[in-house]
Amino acid sequence: MVTHGKKYQDAIKLLDQSVAYAPAEAIDLAKKMSAAKFDETVEMHLKMGLDPKNATQQLRGVAVLPHGLGKTVRVLVFAQGEAEKAAQVAGADVYGGDELIKKIEAGFLDFDVAISTPDMMSKVGKLGKVLGRRGLMPNPKSGTVVPAEDFKKVIEEARKGRVEFKLDRSGIVHIILGKASFEGQMLLENMTSVVDAIIRSKPTGAKGQYIKSAYLATTMGPGVRLDLRAVSAMGGV
């Protein structure tokens, strides 16, 4: 049985679990309930009306957070030849080909985003078990498999706060919005960008209610239920 400490118990007293809060109210409440000694991450969890086993109902995409994630993002690029030089010029923190792949196989994982040129993917593919489970595998659908001329744009987006979202096996999307230390308006604008991207990425096979429930929470805090009408209204901005 999971037990919670006094700080959590005090925090949850602020929450009325029978209420579905407007996004701005939910953010304010989540910030007030953030009682950890570190700067907690603020996350949103959406239960989608999608079947993860249905090929026509897969959801995957990218959102760029206008206020970033509140951390320094290290970008790695798999490239060789002229493309490797382009990665350096574009500002990648780590870049390379075969030797970089060997380095990762040996345990190197000091990066937050991985990008690859299309021609490198046949080699990068063997890192699937290492990178896939950490959400670091380059993927064309998430815009991280690109030609060298797109490196600068993708790297800049990653540093600004480029976040990927994907439907998990339970039909839920988990996505980071920023840090509890962010001002409420910053988190609200990040949330708006995320919801808009998710609505714009609605699969062609989706049927019925697209978003079934939405919750906001900090790393150590309780979940705050969001008003679905208000959340859905964020789409199409």
Swiss-Prot record:
Keyword list (alphabetical) reads: Repressor, Ribonucleoprotein, Ribosomal protein, RNA-binding, rRNA-binding, Translation regulation, tRNA-binding
> Disulphide bridges in this chain?
none
Task: Give the Gene Ontology MF terms in alphabetical order.
Answer: rRNA binding; structural constituent of ribosome; tRNA binding
| Origin superkingdom | Bacteria
Against SUPFAM superfamilies, the record matches this protein to: Ribosomal protein L1 (SSF56808)
What InterPro entries does UniProt report for this protein, alphabetically? Ribosom_uL1_bac-type (IPR005878), Ribosomal_uL1 (IPR002143), Ribosomal_uL1-like (IPR023674), Ribosomal_uL1/biogenesis (IPR028364), Ribosomal_uL1_3-a/b-sand (IPR016095), Ribosomal_uL1_CS (IPR023673)
Ribonucleoprotein: is it a keyword of this entry? yes
Supply one GO BP term: regulation of translation
Name of a matching Pfam family: Ribosomal_L1
**Entry GO terms, CC:** large ribosomal subunit
Subunit annotation: Part of the 50S ribosomal subunit.
Record family assignment: Belongs to the universal ribosomal protein uL1 family.
Q: What is the role of the protein in this entry?
A: Binds directly to 23S rRNA. The L1 stalk is quite mobile in the ribosome, and is involved in E site tRNA release.
Q: Could you identify this protein by its name? A: Large ribosomal subunit protein uL1
Instruction: Please tell me the species this chain comes from.
Output: Dehalococcoides mccartyi (strain CBDB1)
Taxonomic lineage per UniProt? Bacteria, Bacillati, Chloroflexota, Dehalococcoidia, Dehalococcoidales
